[in-house]
């Protein structure tokens, strides 16, 4: 019995050691202030790959949470990667969470600033001897930021999660169609046209201020200038497009549009996965509930597919 116990301990010991994780809170100095992040680092004697996780639109923090939902999607992804021996850094964007002081007024936000911040994080990670390579993983609007940053600062791999394949103004028009009365729909199309042309507009109908309030218009102008598929095509790194089949915000056709822009990219459709990376039925009520269920596990197939992709490109954990 004693010998059996010793053998069992010997078998699980390397596994237990590989699961030792360090949590750190790095700070990145940029020209106008500081960005704050969370580094999840499997303990290792050798350099290991690190993934930079880039959150989606609006006031979404490093963990994937915003005022509309607390689901810890990116925190859960970081934990899943760590179990496979992949380090990760996720960060609060300027104007969000601990990085609020960088842009307390949303008028100061722009896609260009987000991309510069991501590129600066990449450079910091690439200069850290603890890491062998940098992987970019962008979720939702973060997929666009990741694509643009990858073209600016070369990385070992680019992964998009639920990223749009069309200009965001086109997506917005589609989402508003059928949801607004004719007069408001016409006003929204006019506002989108103005912003697409680079012009702010006041006044804004009260019912549309949540989308087109004057303070967010400068950011929308910078966003509407972007073409996600074109940005993705210009990134040279090996690329993986991941899309859930039960995502109610971004459709499979968006993923296919990204792949059409770059046929060498891999496409992985995760059956039943929604926008916050959970396996959830397509019914709206259950979908909405999952946006506030931080304890619900993320899709197992998600981390499995990421690891398969990384392994195929020689990006392996230190324990491999």
Where are these regions (language model features)?
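N-terminal cap/lid segment of alpha/beta-hydrolase-fold proteins
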Residues: 19-45
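Short, surface-exposed "cap/lid" segments of acyl-processing enzymes
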Residues: 45-47, 51-80
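Conserved alpha/beta-hydrolase
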Residues: 73-100
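Alpha/beta-hydrolase active-site loop
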Residues: 106-127
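Primarily recognizes the serine-hydrolase "nucleophile elbow" in alpha/beta-hydrolase
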Residues: 123-178
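Short beta-strand/loop motif that positions the catalytic acidic residue
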Residues: 235, 241-243
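Catalytic active-site module of serine/aspartate enzymes centered on a nucleophile-bearing elbow/loop
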Residues: 276, 282-320
């Amino acid at each position: 019995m004693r010998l059996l116990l010793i053998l069992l301990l010997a078998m699980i010991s390397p596994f237990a050691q590989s699961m030792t994780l360090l949590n750190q809170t790095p700070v990145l100095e940029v020209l106008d202030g500081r960005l704050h992040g969370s580094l999840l680092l499997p303990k290792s004697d050798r350099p290991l790959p690190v993934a930079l996780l880039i959150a989606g639109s609006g006031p979404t923090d490093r963990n994937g949470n915003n005022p509309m939902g607390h689901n810890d999607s990116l925190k859960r992804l970081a934990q899943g990667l760590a179990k496979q021996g992949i380090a990760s850094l996720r960060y609060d964007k300027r104007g969000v969470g601990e990085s609020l002081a960088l842009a307390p007024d949303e008028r100061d936000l722009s896609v260009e600033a987000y991309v510069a911040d991501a590129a600066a994080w990449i450079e910091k990670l690439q200069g850290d001897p603890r890491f062998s390579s940098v992987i970019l993983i962008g979720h939702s609007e973060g997929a666009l930021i990741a694509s643009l940053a990858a073209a600016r600062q070369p990385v070992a791999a680019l992964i998009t999660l639920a990223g749009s394949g069309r200009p965001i103004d086109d997506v917005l028009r589609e989402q508003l169609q059928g949801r607004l009365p004719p007069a408001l729909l016409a006003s929204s199309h006019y506002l989108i046209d103005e912003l697409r042309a680079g012009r702010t507009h006041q006044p804004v109908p009260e019912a549309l201020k949540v989308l087109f309030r004057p303070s967010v218009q400068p950011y929308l102008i910078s966003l509407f200038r972007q073409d996600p598929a074109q940005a993705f095509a210009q990134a040279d790194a090996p690329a993986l497009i991941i899309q859930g089949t039960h995502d109610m915000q971004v459709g499979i056709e968006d993923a296919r549009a990204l792949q059409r822009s770059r046929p060498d990219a891999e496409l992985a459709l995760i059956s039943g996965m929604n926008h916050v990376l959970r396996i959830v039925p397509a019914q709206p009520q259950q979908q909405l509930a999952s946006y506030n269920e931080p304890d619900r596990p993320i899709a197992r197939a998600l981390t499995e597919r990421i690891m398969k992709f990384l392994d195929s490109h020689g990006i392996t954990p230190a324990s491999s």
